[in-house]
Amino acid sequence: MNHKNKSHMKTLVVSVVIAMTSVFNAFSNGNLTQFAYNTTTDGEKVESQTVYTVKNGKYLQQHLKYNYTYDDKGNVSQKEVLKWNEITKVFEKQYCLNITYNAQETSIEYTAWDNKTGAYSDSRAKAVYQTTNAGQGFNYLSYEWNKKENNWNLAKEHAILYGDNALMADK
């Protein structure tokens, strides 16, 4: 895979992580329009980010917290999302995005926090991004966890090719 295709792949993965986080946050909360952020870093790596809602243009109210873990190559391997509980005044675990990489594929698994087990054990969805055709395209595969069968079921598949042969296909 050449440098340009790696760059496209990284951009695509980062975009999807941001989009997935936005979608999950939108479903878990109403129409919040203003946010403030406090980011904690270790060198160039983000360790955590606290998201505040801005009330009346001047008051900050804790909302979400993101914790990041990195693999030995410096790639984000886990993004943990915690939501502020107004009653207990603590951040509570909500879900985790586990990210794995190899030469031709990046996988992002969405796992919800399970209060009964005290762990991220409720797998719900997985997205897989594959480089295809010698770097001339990508496959996007979306899976949903089937609890009865205890395996992943393919929900959507999209193929994206670059150049004159551009094609997008839905399963």
Q: Whereabouts are the PLM-identified features?
A:
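Bacterial Sec-dependent N-terminal signal peptides
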Residues: 1-33
